[in-house]
């Protein structure tokens, strides 16, 4: 089935319901073989020895590496000690995202607790952008600190670091990003990715490096300090930045979750309790709670251009201040969501209204009024909704268009932007996501260059990604005991993903739309007579394909659904498709259709149906709605199923493909057969003055008529 639900929770993104994807399992368990879920999970995590299993299951404070393994840690601590003894001022230069904010807050908390004068500066995302910048450096030099410490930035700012040091400001860089060709030369440089760095783990977040710095300073200045509040910040920033939950990151995040209620900084605890009251009763939050509840609210501060509430929340010990900051963050997040919804809706309306835009391979939209802080989210939504790359631009006060780009399929969006580099002020990113700035006067030339680049065959935009599950889960293992085993592998996250299982041959007992039609709730029957509920977020379109009684396969996570102190096992659906027998019949009909195209007469084929001319108008109306909604590519078997549920008659794949051929021959659509076996169709711009095409004049109609493939002909 064609629902690739990229994320695991409420931010699930709707993808084309009429597209088939290849399902694969990472581990193949032979039928009759002893099924051991714990062993399967251990194998998938590369846990082969008893020692590896012990380290994985019991990751704790003792799993953390010595911070003094960093090449420059001794020097960095000594520099701070000099400033401390001299009573000098320290300035922490951070970043506006959750990793940068938690890094900044962590060092501020340490310095304030140690009696060291420290202040913080966070660049404004909307005005300054990421990291050290010329304007910020000039401002800093007007009131210079004795020591500047960067967190979560600085590795790509060699010239600006040199400028600060020439002005007499000592600089310590703490960062985790890959370095540019020119390595900065501060007095001390803490970055696990630095060339020649001996620190044993390269996967720390920016806040992980800040934590190591604080722990090293605490060891020298105040060894009795409790590090758990810092670890709560480090855990949140590590999850927010999608760092691998391996090695000491696993220990950091586990500690941060286990001791969240007892030891998290007051602002985080209060915000967490307001969003998840069960925390007050001792329930531990999970990484999903961090990712989908706390992180978006902290990131909203940066997106909206005002990080003060976020930094206050993370640094204050006053509950009144923390509650006020949490309320301000909630307001910012609501505004972020409102802007995102409004801009998305406006963008979709423009695409539907503008025929050329709907037909192009690449979406490029600009509006100087669109808020710069949400453009990346909007571009991602449009890319998935219309299944093509998307670039979305807003304007700034300097007369520039600043945009975010998201790719689709195998298309290299950074290479596309580079094709118009002569018109860009700057750009960067990677093949899947990028950012770009263009002067307003050059924007149309830039847009034309991108459209020329994207005038490629549709195959360039096809997604070749398979949908992977850990293994096929037997029905008898769909139970809470299995979930207990899976809980031992927490915390889940990057490089330790929560497992998705393929569960075959389920009975679809009930389905209903919930959440205003946005989500789909199902009841599924297992082969032992038990029933289990399932939810597919942002997947209401699934109701166009399935009915009660269908046999289906699903890709899903096992989850425990808790409400009003009632606990119930539930499936969180990622994909749903027809079971093997139905899919096999579709393939037989597709093969018959292909042989007919190759010249085999209808009488020699099991085509699965004939064409009734009375269905052509209703099929055309049905298809037009699908294409106007931007769905592509299309699986002809799923199109037939959806047409039946939309009120049309039951038709075979062969008939669907003949109807598409006829509409293409009549000039109503353009039709391309894709390498995946699906089709891509586009609506044609119709000339109202042109002569209306006649069905009887089309080659497909004539051949079907001659071979007895048309019924109800007068």
Residue ranges and their predicted role:
Residues 3-4, 11:
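Short, positively charged and aromatic/hydrophobic N-terminal segments
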Residues 17, 26-147, 167-168, 219-448, ...:
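Hydrophobic helix-and-loop "lid/oligomerization" segment in the mid-to-C-terminal part
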Residues 21, 40, 112, 117, ...:
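Acidic, two-metal ion nucleic-acid-processing modules in DNA metabolism proteins
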Residues 80, 137, 161-162, 660:
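Short amphipathic alpha-helical segments and helix-helix/interface helices
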Residues 98, 126, 155, 177-179, ...:
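Conserved nucleotide-binding/hydrolysis micro-motifs of P-loop NTPases
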Residues 106, 183-223, 227-239, 618-619:
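Short alpha-helices
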Residues 151-204:
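Histidine/acidic-residue-rich, glycine-tolerant segments that coordinate divalent metal ions
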Residues 176-177, 371, 430, 519:
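Histidine-centered active-site/metal-ligand motif
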């Amino acid at each position: 089935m064609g629902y690739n639900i990229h994320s695991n929770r409420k931010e699930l993104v709707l993808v084309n319901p009429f597209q088939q994807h290849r399902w694969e399992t990472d581990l193949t368990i032979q039928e009759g073989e002893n099924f051991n879920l714990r062993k399967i999970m251990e194998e998938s995590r590369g846990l082969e020895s008893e020692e590896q299993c012990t380290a994985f299951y019991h990751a704790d404070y003792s799993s953390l590496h010595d911070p003094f393994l960093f090449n420059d840690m001794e020097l960095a601590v000594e520099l701070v000690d000099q400033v401390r003894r001299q009573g000098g001022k320290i300035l922490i230069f951070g970043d506006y995202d959750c990793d940068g904010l938690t890094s900044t807050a962590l060092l501020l908390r340490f310095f304030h607790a140690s009696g060291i004068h420290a202040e913080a500066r966070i660049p404004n995302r909307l005005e300054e952008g990421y990291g050290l910048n010329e304007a910020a450096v000039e401002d800093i030099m007007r009131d210079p600190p004795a020591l500047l410490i960067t967190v979560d930035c600085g590795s790509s700012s060699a010239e600006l670091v040199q400028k600060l040091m020439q002005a007499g400001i000592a600089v310590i860089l703490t960062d985790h990003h890959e370095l540019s060709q020119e390595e900065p030369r501060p007095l001390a440089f803490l970055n696990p990715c630095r060339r020649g760095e001996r620190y044993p783990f390269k996967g720390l977040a920016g806040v992980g490096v800040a934590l190591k710095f604080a722990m090293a300073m605490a060891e020298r200045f105040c060894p009795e300090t409790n590090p758990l509040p810092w670890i709560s910040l480090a855990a949140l920033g590590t999850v927010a930045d999608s760092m691998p939950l391996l090695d000491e990151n696993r220990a950091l995040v586990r500690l941060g979750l286990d001791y969240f209620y007892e030891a998290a900084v007051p602002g985080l605890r209060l915000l967490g309790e307001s969003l998840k009251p069960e925390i007050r009763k001792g329930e531990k939050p999970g990484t999903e709670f961090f990712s989908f509840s706390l992180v978006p609210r902290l990131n909203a501060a940066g997106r909206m251009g005002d990080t003060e509430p976020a930094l206050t929340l993370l640094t204050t010990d006053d509950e009144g201040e923390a509650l006020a900051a949490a309320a301000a963050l909630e307001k910012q997040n609501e505004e972020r969501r409102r802007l995102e919804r409004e801009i998305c809706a406006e963008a979709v309306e423009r695409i539907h209204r503008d025929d050329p835009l709907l037909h192009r391979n690449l979406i490029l939209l600009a509006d100087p009024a669109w808020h710069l802080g949400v453009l990346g989210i909007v571009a991602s939504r449009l890319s998935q909704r219309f299944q093509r790359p998307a670039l979305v631009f807003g304007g700034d006060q300097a007369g520039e268009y600043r945009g975010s780009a998201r790719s689709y399929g195998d298309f290299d969006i950074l290479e596309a932007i580079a094709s118009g580099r002569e018109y860009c002020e700057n750009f960067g990113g990677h093949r899947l996501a990028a950012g770009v700035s263009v002067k307003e006067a050059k924007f149309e030339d830039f847009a034309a260059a991108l459209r020329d680049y994207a005038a490629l065959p549709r195959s360039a935009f096809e997604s070749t990604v398979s949908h992977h599950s850990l293994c096929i889960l037997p029905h008898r293992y769909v139970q809470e005991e299995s979930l207990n085993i899976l809980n031992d592998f927490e915390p889940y996250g990057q490089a330790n993903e929560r497992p998705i299982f393929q569960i075959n041959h389920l009975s679809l007992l009930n389905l209903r739309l919930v959440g205003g039609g946005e989500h789909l709730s199902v009841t599924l029957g297992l082969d032992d007579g038990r029933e289990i509920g399932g939810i597919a977020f942002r997947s209401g379109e699934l109701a166009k394909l399935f009915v009660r009684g269908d046999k289906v396969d699903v890709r899903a996570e096992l989850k425990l659904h808790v409400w009003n102190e009632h606990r119930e096992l539930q499936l969180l659906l990622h994909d749903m498709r027809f079971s093997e027998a139905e899919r096999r019949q579709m393939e037989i009909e597709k093969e018959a259709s292909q042989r007919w195209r190759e010249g085999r007469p209808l009488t020699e084929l099991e085509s699965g149906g004939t064409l009734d001319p009375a269905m052509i108008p209703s099929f055309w109306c049905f298809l037009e709605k699908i294409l106007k909604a931007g769905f592509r590519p299309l699986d002809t078997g799923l199109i037939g199923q959806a047409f039946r549920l939309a009120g049309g008659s039951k038709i075979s794949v062969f008939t669907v493909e003949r109807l598409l051929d006829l509409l293409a021959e009549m000039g109503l659509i353009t039709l391309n057969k894709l390498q995946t076996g699906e089709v891509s169709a586009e609506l044609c711009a119709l000339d109202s003055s042109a002569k209306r095409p006649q069905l009887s004049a089309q080659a497909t109609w004539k051949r079907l008529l001659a071979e007895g493939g048309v019924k109800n002909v007068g």
